[in-house]
Amino acid sequence: MKYLKIYVLRSRLLKDGNLAFFKVKNLQFFDKNFFVTEIRRYLLLDLESWNITNVMFFVTNNLKNTSTFHVVHNFLGLEELKQSLLEITKKFKLLRFKLCSKSYQGNKFFAVLNAFEVKDFLSGDIIFPPHLKLLNSRELLFTKISFNITLKILLKIEAKKASFQKPIKRLNLIIEKDEFFDNYMIFDLTTDGSVTPFNAFIKALQSSNLVTLTNA
């Protein structure tokens, strides 16, 4: 498993945003150019423009040999799942997307996840329309522990109604070596105040699935 160590060197509240310098260590596990390219790409992406706004659960009882699905409220629990439906709903709403086709003029999509097998279901198991790309495809959503039911989950994905401006105002970085000749990066990141530079960086790491995060 790959780990990064992240140290906040300086953090400052500006009149029109936030500024932070932080050091990222333990880069020996990565191709440096690839890591930099991925982080820059995810920091500068419009990660918040598309969101899951509604999650609906449909269940059928496999023991009754019926194909009829019934709506289940997300405040209920199902003993065939390890997680509650409310917890699963929250995990769905953390997923982030990118619009792949600039010619698409709509402002909403629908996606579906069919859960028949007994297994861990990941965000990559969701069936999306071709215009939409999932950015965090390895997130664990829930675990199904019984064949007694089949679960169908319908997702509504919408664009934000308000105009969105990217929170990143400035991004600079350098790669250096310490006294042990280990590579590390210094990030100079300024945001517009809607998100702190450190949280923006963490969100980029989580969306890119490059590493597992831990406290230094």
From Swiss-Prot:
<dbReference type="GO" id="GO:0003899">
    <property type="term" value="F:DNA-directed RNA polymerase activity"/>
</dbReference>
<dbReference type="GO" id="GO:0046983">
    <property type="term" value="F:protein dimerization activity"/>
</dbReference>
<dbReference type="GO" id="GO:0000428">
    <property type="term" value="C:DNA-directed RNA polymerase complex"/>
</dbReference>
<keyword id="KW-0548">Nucleotidyltransferase</keyword>
<dbReference type="GO" id="GO:0009507">
    <property type="term" value="C:chloroplast"/>
</dbReference>
<dbReference type="GO" id="GO:0005739">
    <property type="term" value="C:mitochondrion"/>
</dbReference>
<dbReference type="InterPro" id="IPR036603">
    <property type="entry name" value="RBP11-like"/>
</dbReference>
<keyword id="KW-0150">Chloroplast</keyword>
<protein>
    <recommendedName>
        <fullName>DNA-directed RNA polymerase subunit alpha</fullName>
        <ecNumber>2.7.7.6</ecNumber>
    </recommendedName>
</protein>
<keyword id="KW-0804">Transcription</keyword>
<comment type="similarity">
    <text>Belongs to the RNA polymerase alpha chain family.</text>
</comment>
<dbReference type="InterPro" id="IPR036643">
    <property type="entry name" value="RNApol_insert_sf"/>
</dbReference>
<comment type="subunit">
    <text>In plastids the minimal PEP RNA polymerase catalytic core is composed of four subunits: alpha, beta, beta', and beta''. When a (nuclear-encoded) sigma factor is associated with the core the holoenzyme is formed, which can initiate transcription.</text>
</comment>
<keyword id="KW-0808">Transferase</keyword>
<keyword id="KW-0240">DNA-directed RNA polymerase</keyword>
<dbReference type="GO" id="GO:0006351">
    <property type="term" value="P:DNA-templated transcription"/>
</dbReference>
<keyword id="KW-0934">Plastid</keyword>
<comment type="function">
    <text>DNA-dependent RNA polymerase catalyzes the transcription of DNA into RNA using the four ribonucleoside triphosphates as substrates.</text>
</comment>
